[in-house]
């Protein structure tokens, strides 16, 4: 049998062989795109996102069938309308049984009664100090938190109380709303005017000074209610009782006569009883009181006591000479004058208090008592 050697020739390729033959490098068939690689194990398909279920429909506002005939404001209850109408009529049916002060709402009377009862239901969680009103507690808590929400738009300085910001802004505006009716000099603070009134003898009396200071404070708060004509200074006195007319600055006689009650013109047709005198004036805010006890209670509640120490408040300013503590820096500065010039002495002749100059008491007979310079000068003459 004869064997023939035949040359090999490639035959027809199947689909898999054709795929391998189409690549230059057979390894390329093992490299697949990331999109073609199936994930394993297969992930579970999440259901299509659906919109959240709608919430309950908003509750309709109750009807407000009670309408105020003065301003058109509507209310849902008759009691609310009645309470609102008192703002137009001025009715104050709720009277305090202790002092007779009246209020338009019973809730205001409840708050006022705490002045007489001494009730302090609001306590600070940090230091335990108690207050009669929640607003005072909120202001006190800013001491612990350091919050100062009232910021000056001119310099950026912040304050814990709005009244402190209003007092500070006068330094930028140069406004001096507290005017002396004797000489026309203006002051930015009522206590500065109170000190200035001592320079005018006709205005330094207790009753007259209190009237001038209180009228100046009211005029500064509501300047549109006061009128000025022909160079006169018109100062309102009381609630619509009249206007004290003081002549141009420098007219001391007219000022004294007007402040004494001479030359006042009434603005109302109905005569009213003259207000009780308030000779005790607070040097911090200008508020007047009929009794010294009322002034003392006011100073302790609003400005601290006479030495600047508030009840239950930790003093932050300590005197290095004697160790006495003060809450306010101004009180400490006033106290340091005692160490600088000594304690005030009382004149044995006229009873006035005065400070001795350095070395003044060396040549004076202590047994005869201390005397002021005016009394000693009168004897010399």
UniProtKB/Swiss-Prot annotation:
GO cellular component, as recorded: nucleus
Lineage: Eukaryota, Metazoa, Chordata, Craniata, Vertebrata
Keywords: DNA-binding, Isopeptide bond, Metal-binding, Nucleus, Phosphoprotein, Repeat, Transcription, Transcription regulation, Ubl conjugation, Zinc, Zinc-finger
Role description: May be involved in transcriptional regulation.
Species per Swiss-Prot/TrEMBL record: Mus musculus
PROSITE patterns: ZINC_FINGER_C2H2_1 (PS00028), ZINC_FINGER_C2H2_2 (PS50157)
Primary localisation category: nucleus
Record field: compositional bias (Pro residues): 39-65
Protein name: Zinc finger protein 787
Region spans: Disordered: 1-65
Compartments where found: Nucleus
Keyword field contains Methyltransferase: no
């Amino acid at each position: 049998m004869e064997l023939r050697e035949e040359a090999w020739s490639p035959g027809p390729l199947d689909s898999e062989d054709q795929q391998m033959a189409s690549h230059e490098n057979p390894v390329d068939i093992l490299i697949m795109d990331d999109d073609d690689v199936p994930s394993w194990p297969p992930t579970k398909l999440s259901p299509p996102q659906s919109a959240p279920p709608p919430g309950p429909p908003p509750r309709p506002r109750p009807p407000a069938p009670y309408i105020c005939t003065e301003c058109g404001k509507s209310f849902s209850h008759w009691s609310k309308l009645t309470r609102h109408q008192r703002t137009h009529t001025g009715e104050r049916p709720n009277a305090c049984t202790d002092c007779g002060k009246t209020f338009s709402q019973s809730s205001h009377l409840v708050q006022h009664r705490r002045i007489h009862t001494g009730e302090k239901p609001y306590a600070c969680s940090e230091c335990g100090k108690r207050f009669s009103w929640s607003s005072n507690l909120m202001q006190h808590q800013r001491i612990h938190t350091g919050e100062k929400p009232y910021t000056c738009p001119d310099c950026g300085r912040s304050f814990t109380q709005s009244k402190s910001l209003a007092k500070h802004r006068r330094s930028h505006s140069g406004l001096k709303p507290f005017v002396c009716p004797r000489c026309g000099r203006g002051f930015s603070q009522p206590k500065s005017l109170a000190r200035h009134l001592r320079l005018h003898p006709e205005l330094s009396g207790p009753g007259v000074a209190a009237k001038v200071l209180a009228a100046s404070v009211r005029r500064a708060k509501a300047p549109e209610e006061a009128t000025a004509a022909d160079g006169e200074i018109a100062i309102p006195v009381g609630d619509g009782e009249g206007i004290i007319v003081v002549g141009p600055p420098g007219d001391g006689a007219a000022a004294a006569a007007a402040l004494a009650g001479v030359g006042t013109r009434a603005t109302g047709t109905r005569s009213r009883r003259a207000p009780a005198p308030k000779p005790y004036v607070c040097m911090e805010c200008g508020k007047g009181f009929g009794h010294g006890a009322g002034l003392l209670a006011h100073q302790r509640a609003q400005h601290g006591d006479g030495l600047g120490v508030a009840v239950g408040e930790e003093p932050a300013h300590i005197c290095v000479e004697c160790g006495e503590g003060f809450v306010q820096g101004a009180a400490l500065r006033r106290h340091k004058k005692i160490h600088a010039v000594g304690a005030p002495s009382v004149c044995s002749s006229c009873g006035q208090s005065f400070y001795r100059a350095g070395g003044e008491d060396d040549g004076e007979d202590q047994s005869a008592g201390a005397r002021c310079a005016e009394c000693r000068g009168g004897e010399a003459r």
